[in-house]
Amino acid sequence: MTWMVKLLRQMISMQSQYGAALGATCLLHYLTTSLSIRFFFHDLTVRKHEVMPLGMDYYYLYAIGKDPSHPEIRGSVRKILEKYKTKADKANCALALEAISEHARSVYEYFGFKTYLVFQFGVGEVNSKGEPDPQGKGFTAYLMLYHKDADTIFHA
């Protein structure tokens, strides 16, 4: 079983066992214990610090998603992003997240996020849809950042 499949199973298990918020926190701990994931997070952290001014605080938005079995529930991503954008603007800090699809990327761009790193994830483990495939090319993901004054203070 690949680490991606293990990761997805672990995420589903933790979210059903602990609820989405605590499940995401537990998942982050699970992720950071894996050596390959540590390198993944290290590379993203390095890029964040290249872009943002030295010492700038930021909120890391992790595991934003929607339950596909309830398509009638709308606006949850908007509520999350608007709440954290307001908090970040008041505190003069940034928001950071990763988009794992073109659709997610376009949603985040609508809310003012910009892409600062494009990377492949899951090469040799999953295909472009995230399905297990030992010859898979992985999928494209995007490190995205937001700050109310990004155009003047971020270093592209």
From Swiss-Prot:
<dbReference type="InterPro" id="IPR052564">
    <property type="entry name" value="N-acetyltrans/Recomb-assoc"/>
</dbReference>
<keyword id="KW-0812">Transmembrane</keyword>
<dbReference type="GO" id="GO:0016020">
    <property type="term" value="C:membrane"/>
</dbReference>
<keyword id="KW-1133">Transmembrane helix</keyword>
<protein>
    <recommendedName>
        <fullName>Putative increased recombination centers protein 11</fullName>
    </recommendedName>
</protein>
<feature type="transmembrane region" description="Helical">
    <location>
        <begin position="20"/>
        <end position="42"/>
    </location>
</feature>
<keyword id="KW-0472">Membrane</keyword>
<dbReference type="GO" id="GO:0006312">
    <property type="term" value="P:mitotic recombination"/>
</dbReference>
